[in-house]
């Protein structure tokens, strides 16, 4: 339990119905009591936990009313932080909320650092580190699927799986320690064959977790899809079609889009940052030149490229130049303006000419082929469809890195057993794997790394 008490505004500043000032620590109730006058004569220090009280916040210096509020009291240890927590629900807006916070801080309360409320929940043992990280993922979730994944992690599902793997390692280590302490006895549990079988089982557990990372990463972080092509092939029209709204200006004049336009698309639960770029061509226009350079930068960073060509023109030298800038394996060829066709066209010849195997005939004018385009894009991102994220559990790069380190230690332990190394050397590798897995839940992690993780949070959380 922390000795000092902290406070911060927990809602975004700006006009709104409600603004919340959160106070946590041993002095939370007393601090609020000093500035809160309840409608009924109540002693805030004696009210039950999980109760809500109507009253007024008053400036003790002059007795003037600042705001009408609702005050909720949540006593330790059953609160968000595991400490006494008081939340003051006042009217939204900048001045009122900041004034309430100012009065609380004058009671000897410290302004909270970014993520400090959640950090206290972790340090007080209410949640583990993976659950704390899930809190920020919930805040940042852009789709229902990414929210669902973060919710599973917050509920402790990842912690349970990690702890189950750690317990298997501990069981092996226990038998190894016994065999080291009592070498005169023979134990069936620590024969090389049994140990190899048990370690293989643990290795498979870790690999299963690791195999879910790529899908989990996409759900958590989203992907960047860049629309590329020469001027006037329908890139902006494609953006508008995907978003189902007029986000970009569309004209028949080449070079209308001079800068990148970004927006977000929910593609079957995947957060997709869709980027409409300036058409790549040789130009003397300075502004358009800068837009073309920015397009090149985005193409280098793209997870997938939607390469748009005009079917009424075909593939020409300008298209070939752009093709040299993109990753064809992570691209979707959009053969646009099929509404202008008079006869049959062999669309596969476009795939052969461009070297992009994934293609879709499309009309940005009447949206023909839009659903097929979205399905193709999804297949490129998720080659093996696994549903809406049920099997994905690892989504954080930090978790992936520690799982890989643990896997390497387990493989080293397996190799040591197979080559007949002494069991105490095997124990070194197993203990290392145990530490790496513990770092995911925060059981074996230094203060500097913990502080860095919580610094990513906003103030008030």
Curated annotation (Swiss-Prot):
It holds the Pfam family TrmE_N. CDD domains: trmE, TrmE_N. Binds 1 potassium ion per subunit. Its main location: cytoplasm. Gene3D superfamilies: P-loop containing nucleotide triphosphate hydrolases, Probable tRNA modification gtpase trme, domain 1, tRNA modification GTPase MnmE domain 2. K(+) binds at residues 232, 251, 253, 256. The keyword tRNA processing applies. GO terms for biological process: tRNA methylation; tRNA wobble uridine modification. Residues 222-382 form the TrmE-type G domain. The keyword Membrane does not apply. Its EC number is 3.6.-.-. Keywords: Cytoplasm, GTP-binding, Hydrolase, Magnesium, Metal-binding, Nucleotide-binding, Potassium, tRNA processing. GO terms for cellular component: cytosol. (6S)-5-formyl-5,6,7,8-tetrahydrofolate binds at residues 22, 87, 126, 461. Its cofactor is K(+). GO terms for molecular function: GTP binding; GTPase activity; metal ion binding. It is found in: Cytoplasm. InterPro entries: G_TrmE (IPR031168), GTP-bd (IPR006073), GTP-bd_TrmE_N (IPR018948), GTPase_MnmE (IPR004520), MnmE_dom2 (IPR027368), MnmE_helical (IPR025867), P-loop_NTPase (IPR027417), Small_GTP-bd (IPR005225). It is an enzyme of class 3 (hydrolase). GTP binds at residues 232-237, 251-257, 276-279, 363-365. Mg(2+) binds at residues 236, 257. PANTHER family: TRNA MODIFICATION GTPASE GTPBP3, TRNA MODIFICATION GTPASE GTPBP3, MITOCHONDRIAL. Belongs to the TRAFAC class TrmE-Era-EngA-EngB-Septin-like GTPase superfamily. TrmE GTPase family. Exhibits a very high intrinsic GTPase hydrolysis rate. Involved in the addition of a carboxymethylaminomethyl (cmnm) group at the wobble position (U34) of certain tRNAs, forming tRNA-cmnm(5)s(2)U34. Homodimer. Heterotetramer of two MnmE and two MnmG subunits. This is tRNA modification GTPase MnmE. It comes from Carboxydothermus hydrogenoformans (strain ATCC BAA-161 / DSM 6008 / Z-2901). The lineage of its organism: Bacteria, Bacillati, Bacillota, Clostridia, Thermoanaerobacterales.
């Amino acid at each position: 339990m922390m000795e000092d008490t902290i406070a911060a505004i927990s809602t975004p500043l700006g006009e709104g119905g409600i603004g919340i000032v959160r106070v946590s620590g041993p002095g939370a109730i007393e601090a609020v009591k000093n500035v809160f006058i309840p409608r009924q004569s109540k002693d805030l220090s004696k009210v039950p936990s999980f109760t809500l009280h109507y009253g007024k916040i008053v400036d003790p210096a002059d007795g003037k009313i600042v705001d009408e509020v609702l005050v909720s009291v949540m006593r330790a240890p059953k609160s968000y932080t595991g400490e006494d927590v008081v939340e003051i629900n006042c009217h939204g807006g900048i001045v009122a909320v900041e004034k309430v916070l100012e009065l609380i801080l004058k009671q000897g309360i410290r302004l909270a650092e970014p993520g400090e409320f959640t950090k206290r929940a972790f340090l007080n043992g209410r949640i583990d580190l993976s659950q704390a990280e899930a809190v920020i993922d919930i805040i940042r979730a852009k789709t229902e699927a990414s929210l669902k994944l973060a919710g599973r992690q917050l509920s402790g599902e990842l912690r349970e799986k990690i702890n189950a793997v750690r317990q298997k390692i501990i069981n092996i280590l226990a038998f190894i320690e016994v065999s080291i302490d009592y070498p005169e006895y023979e134990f069936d549990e620590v024969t090389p064959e049994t140990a190899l079988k048990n370690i293989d089982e643990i290795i498979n557990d870790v690999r299963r977790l690791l195999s879910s990372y790529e899908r989990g990463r996409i759900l958590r972080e989203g992907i960047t899809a860049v629309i590329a092509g020469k001027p006037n092939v329908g890139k902006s029209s494609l953006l508008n079609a995907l978003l189902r709204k007029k986000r970009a200006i569309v004209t028949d004049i080449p070079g209308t889009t001079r800068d990148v336009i970004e927006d977000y698309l929910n593609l079957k639960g995947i957060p997709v940052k869709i980027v409409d770029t300036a058409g790549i061509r040789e130009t003397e226009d300075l502004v358009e030149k800068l837009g073309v350079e920015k397009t090149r930068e985005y193409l280098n960073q793209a997870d997938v490229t939607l390469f748009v060509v005009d079917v009424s023109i075909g593939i020409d030298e300008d298209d070939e130049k752009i093709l040299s800038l993109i990753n064809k394996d992570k691209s979707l060829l959009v053969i646009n303006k099929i509404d202008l066709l008079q006869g049959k066209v062999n669309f596969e010849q476009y795939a052969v000419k461009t070297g992009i195997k994934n293609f879709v005939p499309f009309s940005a004018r009447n949206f023909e082929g839009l659903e097929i385009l979205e399905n193709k894009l999804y297949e490129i991102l998720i080659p093996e469809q696994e549903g809406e994220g049920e099997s994905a559990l690892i989504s954080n790069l930090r978790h992936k890195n520690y799982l890989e380190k643990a896997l390497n230690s387990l493989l080293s332990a397996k190799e040591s057993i197979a080559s007949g190394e002494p069991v105490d050397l095997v124990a070194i590798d197993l203990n290392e794997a145990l530490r790496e897995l513990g770092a995911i839940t925060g059981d074996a992690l230094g203060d500097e790394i913990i502080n860095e993780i919580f610094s990513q949070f906003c103030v008030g959380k």
